[in-house]
Amino acid sequence: LREESLASQSFERALGLAPTDGDINHNYGLFLCQTKREPDSIKYFMQAIKNPLYSTPARSYSAAGVCTLRTGQPKEAEEYFVRALRLQPDDPQALINLGQIRYKQGRMDEARRLVAQYNKLDAGDAESLWLALRIERKSGQRVAEQSFANQLRRRFPGSPEYQALQRGNFD
């Protein structure tokens, strides 16, 4: 708790010296999100994005999306992820999270495209393979579903996603 207070003071001091600095605003937004102050974090991500010299606005849109998802606002989060992908089409955080949202909306073709793009970036992780498997399952594509199940079993046998597969808990 003491370190959290010191970190907060350091960020506030830095923002006092450079209130429009994109990196400071982004990092303070991340700090707020990680310390369960998600609604407060959005203001700092948006402040970072406002700076025309800030070089990674997609990163702040993605982070805003994640923090907004944590507050149970998928519609608002969706908007942030879409903006991130407009600026950086291969943003992994935006791809996987928007893929999850599209899956929950029943938009399987778009969810499939997003997760496939994500999997091309790093050959997939347990989360993305699990999402791909569930997309194919809902789409009735049993061969593709089995392929993702095999990859999950082979590459991530100890993962919570594989455990859910073994239990038949698909949602």
What kind of feature is each model-predicted range?
Residues 21, 55-57, 91, 125, ...:
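Residue-level recognition of tetratricopeptide repeat
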Residues 17-18, 51-53, 87, 120-122, ...:
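Structural marker of alpha-solenoid helical repeat scaffolds
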Residues 27, 61-63, 97, 131:
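Canonical tetratricopeptide repeat
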Residues 24, 58-60, 94, 128, ...:
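TPR alpha-solenoid repeat register
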Residues 120-171:
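Terminal, low-structured helical/coil segments at or just beyond the last alpha-helical repeat
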